[in-house]
């Protein structure tokens, strides 16, 4: 129960700090709807494996894990935004609330796409030869793959 409560509080924090500063009426509503969907999908990443159909389980897990990555980036972006606003406050800089609120979902979305692309690419293979002194003759030429 604690993890879901913490997840709910963090979603509420993001919504409370970002949504009111978004322009128009549709943008904040869309952002809050996305947060509600995120709150529903993240547990699906962990509960998806309980599905009897493997394809269904994979879909729920994919959706949940992708949403978890986006949520993580949203949280970090929101915290960084709050830090920027806090540091800018004493200097009476031009209003930063609206532009930084727009930057939060944009940065989070781009970072999530970058992370997804990096996770889906084929890993490079590196061949490294390491000489080990005192190695028994039976192990000469032995290959370790990691």
Region roles according to the model:
Residues 1-123:
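Non-catalytic terminal accessory segments
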Residues 120-126, 131-146:
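Membrane-embedded segments
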């Amino acid at each position: 129960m604690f993890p879901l409560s913490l997840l709910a509080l963090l979603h509420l924090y993001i919504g409370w700090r970002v949504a009111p500063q978004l322009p128009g009426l549709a943008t904040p509503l869309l952002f809050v709807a996305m947060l509600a969907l995120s709150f529903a999908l993240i547990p699906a990443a962990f509960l998806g494996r309980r599905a009897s159909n493997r394809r269904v389980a994979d879909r729920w897990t994919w959706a949940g894990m992708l949403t978890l990555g986006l949520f993580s980036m949203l949280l970090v972006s929101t915290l960084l935004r709050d830090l920027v606003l806090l540091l800018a406050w004493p200097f009476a800089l031009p209003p930063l609330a609206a532009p930084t609120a727009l930057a939060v979902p944009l940065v989070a979305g781009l970072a999530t796409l970058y992370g997804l692309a990096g996770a889906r690419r084929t890993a490079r293979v590196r061949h490294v030869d390491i000489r080990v002194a005192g190695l028994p003759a039976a192990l000469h030429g032995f290959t370790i793959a990691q």
